[in-house]
Swiss-Prot record:
Residue span, C-type lectin domain: 32-151
Tissue specificity note: Expressed by the venom gland.
Assembly and oligomerization: Heterodimer; disulfide-linked.
Lineage: Eukaryota, Metazoa, Chordata, Craniata, Vertebrata
SMART domains for the chain: CLECT
Source species: Bitis gabonica
Function: Interferes with one step of hemostasis (modulation of platelet aggregation, or coagulation cascade, for example).
Subcellular location(s) per record: Secreted
Classification via SUPFAM superfamilies: C-type lectin-like
Name listed for the protein in its UniProt record: Snaclec 2
Keyword Signal: yes
Superkingdom of this protein's organism: Eukaryota
Keyword Membrane included in the entry's annotation: no
Length: 156
């Protein structure tokens, strides 16, 4: 009976450890909360960075940030992988002007739930600001070249 309990609990540990790993990210991409992420230290304009992310496959976009935990993960990813130490890093948040109002939308189509915006300027694109260790979002000119972070849901 003792061996059965020991074997059963051992199998349970193996099962539980594997159950959280139901997806894999490609080489050089990092997993977090059911998505794959990669920081690119190749400065591009916002629209070009978004196009590049979409070409990475599987519905890729510039990063959308939905929680403080994800913001912390992305900030660490930038620190670990973008060595040029730029003032800003592109993210997938844009102001969308529609007639008399302006709304913010992620390039992946998701709604803006978590916000950490510094309201200093009124540009159309957003970047993560170096001054705040890439945790605050700032309006910046879409035509400037900056490194960027891509995100996509993995293939299961």
């Amino acid at each position: 009976m003792g061996r059965f309990i020991f074997l059963s609990s051992g199998l349970l540990v193996v099962f539980l450890s594997l159950s959280g790993a139901d997806f894999e990210c490609p080489s050089e991409w990092r997993p977090f909360d059911q998505h794959c992420y990669r920081a690119f230290d190749e400065p591009k304009r916002s629209a070009d960075a978004e196009k590049f992310c979409s070409e990475q496959g599987n519905s890729g976009h510039l990063v959308s940030i939905q929680s403080k935990e994800e913001a912390d993960f992305v900030a660490q990813l930038i620190s670990d992988n973008i060595k040029s130490s730029p003032d800003y890093v592109w993210m997938g948040l844009w102001n969308q002007r529609r007639e008399q109002y302006c709304s913010r939308k992620w390039t992946d189509g998701s709604n803006v739930i978590y916000k950490n915006v510094a309201e200093r300027f009124t540009k159309n694109c957003f970047g993560l600001e170096k001054e705040t260790e890439y945790r605050t979002w700032l309006n910046i000119l879409c035509g400037d070249d900056y490194p960027f972070v891509c995100k996509f849901p993995p293939r299961c």
